[in-house]
């Protein structure tokens, strides 16, 4: 059985929209994973962006993810404690930092992102999913 796939906010949006920026290897991996997960923080991030006019979302946009079999996972105390594992990101976007920490808090998880700063960390469980 494939490992757990954890996707960041941008990847979740690309999946929901069928965006071609996701590379074929990522799509194949996500289709074969035992579980595909995104953070509830991603929902909050998207709501904030929609609220300030940076993004237009349908009223029930979270259903788009659930209908694709993506599980939405709460941010836990364990995830919060994992933030200290990434001191080089102290000035990076807080949502990205928290989502990375959440993905890294559970073993056997692969994190999919297009964020250059997160990919540049060189972690073996972080995958660059953009073309």
Show the residue positions of the predicted features.
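Acidic catalytic patch
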Residues: 64-89
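Short, conserved active-site loop motifs that form the nucleotide-linked donor/cofactor pocket
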Residues: 34, 70-71, 109
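Acidic, PIN/NYN-like endoribonuclease modules and their adjacent C-terminal/linker elements
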Residues: 2, 100-131
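Alpha-helix capping/helix-boundary segments
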Residues: 11, 42, 79, 99, ...
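Short, well-structured N-terminal submotif of metal-dependent ribonuclease cores
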Residues: 1-38, 51-63, 120, 130-131
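Donor nucleotide-sugar recognition loop
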Residues: 89-95
């Amino acid at each position: 059985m494939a490992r757990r796939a954890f996707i960041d906010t941008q990847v979740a949006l690309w999946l929901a929209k069928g965006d071609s920026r996701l590379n074929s290897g990522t799509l194949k991996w996500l289709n074969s994973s035992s579980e595909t997960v995104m953070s509830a923080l991603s929902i909050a991030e998207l709501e904030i962006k929609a609220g300030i006019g940076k993004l237009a979302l349908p009223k029930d946009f979270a259903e788009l993810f659930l209908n694709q079999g993506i599980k939405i996972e709460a941010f836990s105390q364990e995830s919060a404690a994992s933030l200290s594992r990434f001191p080089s990101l102290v000035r990076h976007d807080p949502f990205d930092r928290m989502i990375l920490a959440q993905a890294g808090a559970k073993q056997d998880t692969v994190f999919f992102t297009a964020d250059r700063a997160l990919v540049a960390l060189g972690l073996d469980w972080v995958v660059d999913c953009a073309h």
